[in-house]
């Protein structure tokens, strides 16, 4: 489930960036670097210290979830480009909602008791 939900979360992020932000592509730094972080966390989850990777995935997904919400608030330190329209807000709703399954599954895994050999 972790991989499927990570793919959904990543897709929501990419759709937000490429479809809603002016001039963004899959290789724009605003998309490429977060994609690399996601890939590294999933590689660590698959082959490295799983608990630490799960905590990292949880933090990363929570950051994306909060970013999807906070970045549309009218805070003076945030740039408002593109314009804050219903279309833009709908992309943020999509972006935030696609993070929820990954937050939930990683939270459940972090809370699962660890077994000692």
Residue ranges, per PLM feature:
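Polytopic alpha-helical membrane-helix bundles and their juxtamembrane interface segments
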Residues: 1-117
């Amino acid at each position: 489930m972790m991989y499927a939900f990570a793919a959904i979360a990543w897709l929501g992020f990419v759709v937000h960036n490429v479809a809603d932000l002016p001039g963004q592509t899959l290789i724009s730094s605003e998309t490429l670097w977060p994609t690399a972080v996601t890939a590294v966390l999933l590689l660590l989850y698959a082959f490295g210290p799983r608990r630490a990777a799960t905590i990292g995935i949880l933090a990363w997904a929570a950051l994306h979830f909060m970013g999807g919400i906070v970045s549309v608030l009218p805070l003076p330190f945030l740039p408002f480009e593109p314009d804050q329209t219903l279309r833009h807000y709908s992309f943020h709703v999509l972006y935030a909602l696609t993070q929820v399954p990954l937050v939930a599954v990683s939270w459940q895994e972090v809370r699962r008791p660890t077994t000692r050999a």
